[in-house]
Amino acid sequence: MMETCARRVLFTAALLVLSTVIAETFSTDSDTDNPLSTETFYSRASGLKQTSSWPGREATATAVDLSSGLGEMTEIPASVSITAAREGHSPKPLQTSTNAADWKTSTTSDETTEHLQSDTELTHNATAQWESPSSASHSITSHHPVTETRTVRDVTDLIDMDTTDSVSHTDSTYISTTNRVGERTLLSVISNSTFAYTQNSSISDAESQTSPWEEKTSGATQVNEETEETVSTVSEQTDPTFEGRNTTSATLETERSTLSQGTESQTGQPSVTGQTAKEVTDIDNPNSTPPLTVTSRDVEETDATSVSSETSYTQTSSDSASSILPFTSSEHNVTSTSQESHNSTLIYSTNTGGSTEFSTGSVSSTAHEETERSSTRIVDETTLHDVTSAPPVLEDVATTIDDSLSKFPSGQSPTIPKTDDQTNTQVVPTSTHRPQVTDEATDEVSTVYSSTTTLTTTTPSVTTRQLQPHYTTVQTQTQHTTIVTTDIIQVLRTTPSTAHHVPTLTTSGPQAPSTADSSDVTTLHLETSTATPGNTTAHGGRATTPFSKSSPGRTTVVVTTGHLTDKSTTETGSATTQMPLRTSASPGHVCGPKTCANGGHCVRSAEGSYYCQCLSAWTGPFCTEDVDECVNSPCPQGSVCVNTGGSFSCECDLGFDLEDGRSCTQVKTFLGTFTVNNSLHLRNLGLHELHREIQQLLNASLSIFHGYRRFTLGKRDGQGVQIPVVSMFSLSSNVTSADVFNSIQMSLNNCSRTYSHCPIKLQHQLSYHVESLCMAQKTKCDVQYSDCSDISGIPNCQCLPGYFKRNPEDMTCRDCGDGLKLVNGKCVECMFGFGGFNCNNFYKLIAVVVSPAGGALLLIVVIALIVTCCKKDKNDINKIIFKSGELQMSPYAEFPKSNRVSMEWGRETIEMQENGSTKNLLQMTDIYYSPALRNSDLERNGLYPFSGLPGSRHSCIYPAQWNPSFLSDDSRRRDYF
């Protein structure tokens, strides 16, 4: 038994040692056997990263190398531009330019005049008939933007932001294209005066006029001014008796095509009368009307009139013939067909006293509309009265005509012979582009439709002198001559109408074709004489149109008209217009309004040649080459110079704005995109209107926030038209991305046709959504520990829960480390027993608390086991003696008991009787075996009742009697007999 107990004690000691080892393993100072291993490596993406590890655990700390990583993390390729305006140029709009997420935009053309200068050529077919029926027609194909027709009397001052047009004092028709606030105005003029190539005309002795004209070349719009000297001398003497007789009236009725939207028409009736004259239209007086064909065309690369159009006057006379003059464009040679949509009839009436003869010429013009253009067609017409207006001679073409009505000897100045009767002669300067004369015989009566232009002139007998250069005064014998001019200009929308009956026209006089090379004047001479109605004298022949080339720089075109009566003599002055002619030393470089582009001026050198004096932003022989201003680095530090047509712009990175043109400062930036879902009919002009409405919407939506600076618009192609928007606020503003979106969305939801910014939105289903500034700037946040957020208008790397940044501008986040926890942005220590990241681990609690408690419990269990084992060995005899409450039977039960006691210690002497008198003589404690004696005696005599260990069934003779003081010792055993 002792050996068994020893083994158990050793086992208990081993368990104690094991528990001690376990406790040391989980304790804080148990890492001495496992040294910490540290590994450091550098990554370009995340910076310097250090990893510390030991068996079973690993902790990582990341630090950013600002010296190398910052360049990549702050790389923001997107940009916003501001275009700097230069002197002499129209201001360029602000630009937005980015190179991330298709935010790159560029706006270099002026919004106002982008589509005002049409590239479409006007091609004319002119047909004139001088015999009965007398008619002239021409067809015009043109394209113009939406225009507004006004007269001088209706509009006293046209002011649109930075453009102001002076008021005209003569009867002129202004055709102006008026845009909204902040945009420019293109002004076209139709003038009925003696001043060719002018806009603002007035009859005076000498006047210097300025004609603004606009030109768009290479995306840049420049405003040029050209000064013309106009000298006009008109002497008038009026007799009250001839007020109703000597009156000139003109009526213009025009029908415009209404296929394009947004056309506005205003009608006025200006009237200019001399002395006490009144408006008279006498249709009962005999008339003599020379036919007049008025053509207009736009010239893209050659010189033009004050509104970039060339006006050509053509008068022909033939016997039952029509003169067709095809006008050939410098770029296109397209002849439009005549349609019944835009006609005009010109009727001249001349009062000759008692005569009742009259002749009428009609002019019909037809406008053929281009299907791909949707804007109002405009025909620049110039009416002729006693004082006529002619455009500058753009190309000098020598034309040889045979069989003419008027003959001039070669080398002599052309003269105008007098007719037999009272003659009304019109001298019209004519400038055409390579005219070709074609004769056709026709006797049909022409019926024209659409707009009608009627010019009625009532004058006495006229004697016209020869054209004189420069200032001319013509002495005529006139009695009580009165010059009264009354112009009535009416612009009406009418239905097609039929022209008046055209009487015959009679021509007479010497006829000779001539080309006067020595003449300095390009003229068209026409002689007419009246006859009684019904009697027509037809003379076959061709119209004579002499042209001449002249080397002088200026040519004076003199138109002199005299009126004759029978009583008095009046000296009538002449109106003189001096116009510069295009003369150049080299045939390829001539001086004209469009010779020098982009605001350049044509200057004549001392040698007689012409050259272009360009503005500082342009260069080249024709001022068409842009100067790269970015070579001189004009932009401040931090911005990028972008060269544009005629200027340059300084662009800051996206998220920055140019502050006072000096430096790029950081601003709050919010990105968004307007999407036009229905862009089927959206053309360039519609896109311009869409931009204007979006600007109004953004100004109304964003100006309510504090710190609002500006916004920029761009264009991005995709499914539908997409217009990116960059809205900028100052850093002091507390606006957020949600505020901007809600304000714009509210404006769109409240949109109706009563608002100014809504028609396009309702038509094209305009919508707005927010774009990510983080994606546009490619902000490099550490995706493992942070997320990019642009809610405040500034890209910010928002740390995940449990991480923090030492500086707000840092791109990476870090943790507090082991044993610390982030609380309100500060790192605090963990509670007892907790550690790890953000105090989420409790291994310390296990090592410090659980391990000792477990060891103590194990020790208690071991002690209890030892005690239990020892207690079991002591109580085993009870289980041997007593078993289920039954007595053990002695092997000597057959022997009778004796009640007698022998005094001898031997077995033979002891007797016991069974009677009751001697039964209790022996007590349980009276009989003892002598251990030595007993053992020796029993073993010697062979009477030992058992041979086994104590506790066997042979341990006692009489099982019913047992000594309770028996010890488990072989030397102390007692038997009962």
Swiss-Prot record:
Segments crossing the lipid bilayer: 846-866
Biased composition (Polar residues): 93-110, 200-212, 244-296, 325-366, 404-435, 499-538, 545-563, 570-586
Regions of compositional bias (Basic and acidic residues) in chain numbering: 112-122, 367-384
GO molecular function: calcium ion binding
Pfam families in the cross-refs: EGF_CA
Disulphide bridges: C591-C602, C596-C612, C614-C623, C630-C641, C635-C650, C652-C664
CDD domains found in the cross-reference section: EGF_CA
SUPFAM superfamilies: EGF/Laminin
EGF-like domain sequence ranges: 587-624, 626-665
Keyword Secreted attached: yes
Region spans: Disordered: 85-153, 200-391, 404-445, 499-586
Biased composition (Low complexity): 132-144, 311-323
PANTHER family for this protein: HEART DEVELOPMENT PROTEIN WITH EGF-LIKE DOMAINS 1 (PTHR24037), PROTEIN HEG HOMOLOG 1 (PTHR24037:SF3)
Protein name, UniProt field: Protein HEG
Protein species of origin: Danio rerio
